Amino acid sequence: MQAQKSYDLAGKSIFIALPAYDFKVSLKLAVSLARFAQAAPQHGIDIQIGSICGCSVVSRARNLLVQDLLESPCDYLMFIDSDINFEPDDILRLMAWGSDPKKGIVAGVPRTRSETKTYIANLEYDENGELTMNGMGLVRAERVATAFMLVRREVFEQMIEAHPEWKYYDKKTDRMIPCLFDFQLTEEGYMGEDYLFCDRAREIGFEVWVDPSISLGHMGVQEYMGDYGRDVLYPMIAPSVKDVA
């Protein structure tokens, strides 16, 4: 599916959120962003870009970027980690999928920076042990990494409304910041801020979906090119898929 042909994205706006602890992004990411910035106006999309640099606590950086989104008029927040490479159409696809109000989180699945093809996502299975797809390629998930994640603005707004006690005063920026991304000890062990955020979004009624057709590069000493569909999903899909509208 070509998102720009199947959905009308005109008038939509997106906040590109870049947490970059070491004040730099990969050259490939810079080129990807430039290409998306060229493509977006052709689809009537407005862009804002925000970054938090030098913050060693990634959950704080993400929360600050959420507040930046909320102070903007943008419809979506797009988290992109500083070591992720993508194609401009990948963001257009996620925006198209995210036009469904139920799909609060839609993401590509990054590969870890290792020779083993390990991916950072937990898919959702029903009571019969079957996966759920939307009939157009998306797969429902329980949790996914924030490395390349689109979030509807309403997810943040409704989470804050449900939990006003999560706001805290950030002295450095002199603002009240929603603590939506956090680390937590659970029965499963130590849970990172990305998985906990997905749990919190699902608790207030939003769905989490992943697009296995998106191939992301993950930069390290070398580029670890991922293909979640080919490596993980498609080999297991035939006996364990249930389509939903």
Regions found by a protein language model. Give the residues of each.
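C-terminal catalytic/acceptor-binding lobe
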Residues: 1-11, 15, 163-245
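Conserved catalytic core of nucleotide-sugar-dependent glycosyltransferases
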Residues: 66, 87-182
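N-proximal low-complexity "stem/linker" segments adjacent to membrane-targeting elements
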Residues: 1-56
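Conserved donor sugar-nucleotide recognition element shared by glycan-biosynthetic enzymes
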Residues: 58-62, 194
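Short, Asp-centered acidic motifs that coordinate Mg2+ and/or phosphate
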Residues: 76, 103-105, 208
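Alpha-helical elements of Rossmann-like donor-binding domains used by nucleotide-donor carbohydrate transfer enzymes
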Residues: 32-35, 64, 93
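Active-site nucleotide-sugar/metal-binding loop of Leloir-type enzymes
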Residues: 63-76
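Short beta-strand-to-loop acidic/aromatic patch adjacent to the donor-nucleotide binding site
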Residues: 73-85
